[in-house]
Regions:
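Hydrophobic, lipid-facing positions within transmembrane beta-strands of outer-membrane proteins
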Residues: 67-73, 103-106, 158-162, 221-225, ...
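Transmembrane beta-barrel strands of outer-membrane/channel proteins
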Residues: 45-53, 86-90, 120-122, 175-179, ...
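Repeated loop/turn-to-beta-strand initiation elements of outer-membrane beta-barrel proteins
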Residues: 80-86, 116-118, 170-173, 233-236, ...
Length: 430
């Protein structure tokens, strides 16, 4: 009965909201024109209704995976010597039953020298060569948004940072300073169920994780750099990071509470034309500084990571891409020896394969896409089918899914099986 009532409410929500969107749309267009004509402020954004439902019964979470109204506003003003950018979302979330504001950008950009660009404030940071796989990219992610069916834009979470880019004849250099650790939005049970190793079962809202996040300015800072060089079309890069694991990869057994151990990353990448497409390689060493000996079972070991990928156009308006990803745990014998009894053991090598297929139809207004992860070592995977149709320059409709599968409940993707969901959205862009 509860499920039927929820389906009825979601259906009503999906039918009634589109009727009110045209009135909202007209008002947003008028506001956009006013801001530019009177204040020379460029305004963009969208108004979106997005709704989704779990396809499996999950006793630990609500049946609705997503049910929200989102208004994004992107404002920018050029003051000749500096540009001000503000991007924020107003969100009415019927799953969490909250109204929230999400500030995604609030920064100043300027160029004090011909060879220097500076951006200070809240911003989205990203680098590396992977397609939804990350080795060099050590910046915050929002895994909850990714798994419940929000736009892929929301996988990248903002950082409060200062970024300086220097452009030399021989190479380019990016320096990033984050005065206080930001961290990723991880699966804690409040929205998505997960494998709880302490309970030895799937848990959710009945046992939400709690963490202790480093939050002292200056003391709990993050530092990152990237050095890039283009040699006749071949893109080379070296990366460095000094900070913390972006998700809580440790536990304080005395409290107990999840913690963010200290981490350094040293990585490199190459991207070049290959076999009529684009190929890329990425290597990384994750130095888990709080457990360099590898004998502390409460902190994730150091590891090597490797990523190789290739993408190309298979036919007109049809592209494909494949990737291979590897995690190799260092000091595996020590990890096995000190692992507490009853805790499921990780593999020394974790392999992941990905496939992306994208087809454009109807004058490229209809996009059919399919992205899947599969781990042969974990025997689990995750599929992301999506259909996006651009009705006109203003209106877009989208349907998609997040499909998890796996042989065991304790593997990375396998633990999310009960979170499998389908969603639909209607968006007006202004």
């Amino acid at each position: 009965m509860k499920r039927r009532r929820l389906i009825f409410l979601i259906t009503c929500f999906g039918l009634i909201l589109p009727l009110s969107l045209p009135a909202w749309a007209e008002g947003l267009e008028g506001l956009k024109d006013l801001l530019y004509d009177k204040y020379e402020i460029d305004a963009y954004g969208f108004l979106e209704a997005r709704s989704g439902l779990r396809l499996r019964d999950d006793p630990y979470e609500k049946d609705a995976s997503i049910n929200e109204i989102r208004l994004q506003t992107d404002l920018s003003r050029d003051f000749e010597w500096v540009e001000l950018k503000i991007k924020f979302d107003l969100l009415g979330d019927l799953v969490s039953e909250e109204v929230d504001a999400d500030l995604r950008d609030l920064n100043l950009s300027f160029s004090p020298l011909d060879i220097m660009d500076v951006k200070v404030g809240r911003q989205i940071l990203t680098w590396g060569t992977g397609d939804l796989l990350f080795v060099a990219d050590s910046f915050p992610k929002d895994w909850v948004s990714f798994f419940v069916g929000r736009d892929t834009e929301y996988l990248k979470a903002p950082s409060d940072a200062a970024r300086m880019s220097l452009f030399f004849d021989f190479f380019n250099l990016d320096l990033v300073y984050i005065p206080k650790f930001n961290g990723s939005v991880y699966i804690d049970g409040s929205r998505l169920s997960y494998w709880n190793p302490m309970l030895g079962r799937i848990a959710g809202r009945d046992d939400v994780f709690h963490d202790h996040k480093p939050d002292d300015y200056g003391t709990d800072s993050e530092y990152a750099l990237r050095l890039t060089k283009n040699i006749e079309g071949t893109e080379l890069a070296l990366y460095g990071y000094y900070g913390f694991w972006q998700t809580p990869e440790g536990v304080d057994p005395l409290i107990p509470v999840l913690i963010y151990p200290e981490l350094s990353i040293f990585s490199a990448s190459i991207r070049d034309a290959l076999w009529g497409g684009i190929g890329h390689l990425e290597f990384g060493y994750y130095d888990s500084r709080d457990d360099r000996s590898g004998d502390n079972p409460n902190i994730r070991n150091s590891e090597f990571r490797f990523l190789a990928g290739f993408e190309r156009e298979l036919s007109q308006d049809f592209t494909g891409g494949i990737q291979y990803y590897l995690e190799y745990m260092q000091d595996y014998e020590k990890y096995e020896r000190h692992l507490p009894e009853g805790i499921n053991k990780k593999d020394e090598y974790r392999h992941v394969l990905t496939l992306r297929l994208t087809k454009l139809l109807m004058n490229q207004n209809l996009t059919l896409s399919f992205f899947t992860y599969y781990s042969p070592s974990d025997a689990d995977g995750y599929m992301r089918p999506n259909v996006n149709y651009k009705i006109n320059d203003k209106w877009t409709v989208e349907i998609g899914g997040n499909i998890f599968f796996g042989s065991d409940d304790h593997t990375f993707f396998g633990q999310f099986k009960e979170n499998t969901n389908a969603y639909a959205s209607l968006r007006f862009s202004y």
